[in-house]
Amino acid sequence: MKIKKLLKNGLSLFLTFIVITSILDFVRRPVVPEEINKITLQDLQGNTFSLESLDQNKPTLLYFWGTWCGYCRYTSPAINSLAKEGYQVVSVALRSGNEADVNDYLSKNDYHFTTVNDPKGEFAERWQINVTPTIVLLSKGKMDLVTTGLTSYWGLKVRLFFAEFFG
């Protein structure tokens, strides 16, 4: 009898958590700039690209983060693993210092995802990003999904799976 009650309470707590995080993601949802695919970006290696120039047959994970962000310390390793597995990842280092500072941080943490430095937060402002980390999943040039705050490798992997096969 106790196990049944424990399972019922656990399920109730889990569903409440899912509802609350979904509401928070909806409220924190960024606004996609109209010219999303035309925006030219430059990564820390000096490569210039646009979101449109990325493979449109694969979902793109756009990851807004900061070196100062506590939750990002837990999310960035998951993002790095996904990038190593071949997923398209473009990260935006938000207000994290100059390029040398960001490169140093990436190197110290052994992160190898494509990174654009946004030292003044101008790019993030165009998206109305108010929370880090914010992860925007782009599919065929459109925003497919958004998640904010702490998220896991498996949570992202499931989202990417759905974007690849149903997006």
From Swiss-Prot:
Keywords of the record? Cell membrane, Disulfide bond, Membrane, Redox-active center, Transmembrane, Transmembrane helix
Q: Which InterPro entries is this protein grouped with?
A: AhpC/TSA (IPR000866), Thioredoxin-like_sf (IPR036249), Thioredoxin_CS (IPR017937), Thioredoxin_domain (IPR013766), Thioredoxin_ResA/DsbE_sf (IPR050553)
Gene3D superfamilies cross-referenced by the UniProt entry: Glutaredoxin (3.40.30.10)
Annotated membrane topology? Single-pass membrane protein
Q: Name one GO molecular function term.
A: antioxidant activity
Residues forming the Thioredoxin domain are 30-167
Principal cellular location given in the protein's record: membrane
Q: Which spans are transmembrane here?
A: 10-27
* Domain of life (superkingdom): Bacteria
Disulfides per UniProt: 69-72
Q: Which PROSITE patterns match?
A: THIOREDOXIN_1, THIOREDOXIN_2
Places the protein is found: Cell membrane
Similarity comment text for this entry: Belongs to the thioredoxin family.
Which named protein is this?
A: Thioredoxin-like protein HI_1115
